[in-house]
Amino acid sequence: MLRDTMKSWNDSQSDLCSTDQEEEEEMIFGENEDDLDEMMDLSDLPTSLFACSVHEAVFEAREQKERFEALFTIYDDQVTFQLFKSFRRVRINFSKPEAAARARIELHETDFNGQKLKLYFAQVQMSGEVRDKSYLLPPQPVKQFLISPPASPPVGWKQSEDAMPVINYDLLCAVSKLGPGEKYELHAGTESTPSVVVHVCESETEEEEETKNPKQKIAQTRRPDPPTAALNEPQTFDCAL
């Protein structure tokens, strides 16, 4: 009886240990598979490559061009090519990012017509929403009047919003209505307060300066009269032969 109970207990313990090991293996390998899936996710990679410093024969000879294109058609049958002869570059457009990645890994710095083939991924064109989230946004275009940011803002510095300047439009309107020799009543008088009237007058300093230092008038030089008598008299020339 005791042996049977011990045997059953050992069997249960072994079953528990085996199940625990299986669960641990599943957890470990499951996590590794998830990590591998994340590492092998090539959806963010571009689908185009740039081949730089391509041999000139690719742009001139048709056979060399077909030979160059055959290197990449192995990875994708729908691949297209854009040749830039002046820059000696070729843009290779694949239908899938996996094909572009394989071609980049296997053909980068391989020999082609005696030159090493340089392959680089093309820049990924992101949408406007993704670009706004991935880059630092500029500050809101708040109108600033007086305060400008420092040359090197310290850590934690924030732009303070200035209050709009107070403009007395009544005063500007009153000044615009003033004219020479006219008066303008700012405040009407009451029984207990006098009225405020503005009279526009000329500056006394300007009049004093004009009397002390009068402006000198420059007289124009008179044009001399032509010598009429000399022109009317006949002229004789003596010539000795």
UniProtKB/Swiss-Prot annotation:
GO terms for cellular component: cytoplasm; cytosol; nucleus. Residues 7-19 have a biased composition (Polar residues). InterPro entries: Calcipressin, Nucleotide-bd_a/b_plait_sf, RBD_domain_sf. Highest expression in heart, skeletal muscle kidney, liver and peripheral blood leukocytes. Lower expression in all other tissues. Residues 183-203 are annotated as: Calcineurin-binding. Pfam families: Calcipressin (PF04847). Residues 1-23, 202-241 are annotated as: Disordered. GO terms for biological process: anatomical structure morphogenesis; calcium-mediated signaling. GO terms for molecular function: calcium-dependent protein serine/threonine phosphatase regulator activity; phosphatase binding; RNA binding; troponin I binding. Belongs to the RCAN family. Interacts with protein phosphatase PPP3CA/calcineurin A. Inhibits calcineurin-dependent transcriptional responses by binding to the catalytic domain of calcineurin A. Could play a role during central nervous system development. This is Calcipressin-3. The lineage of its organism: Eukaryota, Metazoa, Chordata, Craniata, Vertebrata.
